[in-house]
Amino acid sequence: TGQFRSVGEAVEVCRAFMEYRKVIFVKKGVYKEKVVVPSWLTNIEIVGEDRDKTVITYDDHANVPLKETGLPMGTFRTYTVKIEGCDITLRNITIENNAERLGQAVALHTEGDRLTFVNCRFLGNQDTVYTGMQNTRLCFEDCYIEGTTDFIFGPSTAWFENCEIRSKADSYVTAASTPADIQ
């Protein structure tokens, strides 16, 4: 009932390197799509109408064959949402990778700096949240994150404030690869 039929369409019309803040309001619903916020988009806030009822979901996993080669796609192409831009905020939204437990399946893949996630849910199994770039900073506030095997991983500096982190299996929660020179 909004101006766009998908979250990806709303992101696509944003201007590159905006100096002002752009807010994308997402109505309640389930959006089955892969969303990429490219590196040239900055100062965007994506706000869901209701955290539990505004869901972006997809079901890729590491063993899905690529159409071009037939080879497995691997971990880093499995994302549901990939954020390459800087100064991006997500609020009141669920990001889910609902692939069966057939290998790595990333819900959130981050590459941008100064990313903020407020009152969001991140759902998956293995590798739910990938903090993907060295020397980038992420802030998670009042979020819920669940998974099975090392489901928060990567080299970014990530701060978790008042978050619930739930392991769905008896396994490791994190697999940080923060460089040794970062304290």
Model region roles, listed by residue range:
Residues 1-183:
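Sequence-level preference for short, compositionally simple segments enriched
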